[in-house]
Design a protein with these regions (language model features):
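Bacterial N-terminal signal peptides
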Residues: 11-21
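Early exported N-terminus immediately downstream of N-terminal targeting peptides
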Residues: 67-71, 75
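Surface-exposed patches in mature extracellular/periplasmic domains of secreted proteins
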Residues: 62-67, 107-116
Length: 183
């Protein structure tokens, strides 16, 4: 294997990955005795439940010791809240749903986009979208207020951290759009 160049090794690995992907896809073909593909998956869930699952997937679990002031699936601990070191999944789920419900109420006036905006605000904070003394109102919100529906680019612009586009955040935004955007 020493005589193989990096380029050849890369091609071999890609070929093996494509072969494995093909085999996996063949194993997932529906049969007559199994439920149809449309009956399965996240799109069968109500939009709010899709939003909760998406947040849980991308936020991951926050331990109070390592991630203070965040806990559970990204709940920010407020000054009046006291939590024990071992937060249960049930309590964390309740906190996430409560936070998301509050954000939905905050964006209620935006109608069918309120859940999408709430999920974005859960990650970046509501004032990066709504604007305040530190941040101007986002272009995304301005477009929604004008009734424009081509908001994909503006939504995907929220994938920056320290002025760099972060691929993992971009994937998250694309997933959120696919799950929650209503054209």
């Amino acid at each position: 294997m020493r005589f193989m160049t990096g380029k050849i090794r890369t091609y071999i690995i890609l070929a093996l990955l494509l072969l494995c992907q093909n085999i996996m896809a063949q194993n997932k073909t529906p049969t007559t005795d199994s439920p149809s593909q449309s009956d399965l998956g996240i799109f069968a869930l109500p939009p709010f439940e899709r939003a909760v699952r998406c947040i849980k997937y991308y936020e991951g679990w926050h331990d109070i010791k390592r991630n203070y002031p965040y806990i559970g699936w990204g709940h920010r601990i407020l000054p009046h809240e006291k939590f024990k070191k071992n937060l249960t999944y049930l309590k964390a789920d309740s906190l996430l749903r409560s936070d998301l419900t509050k954000l939905c109420a905050m964006f209620r006036r935006y109608g069918k986009d309120s859940l999408l905006l709430a999920v974005l605000a859960y990650n970046v904070g509501p004032y990066k979208i709504l604007g305040n003394s530190k941040f101007p109102k986002s272009h995304l919100l301005e477009k929604i207020e004008r009734g424009l529906r081509n908001i994909e680019k503006d939504y995907l612009d929220f994938c920056r951290w320290r002025d760099k586009c972060i691929p993992s955040i971009r994937r998250r935004r694309m997933t959120e759009l696919q799950l929650l955007y209503i054209p």
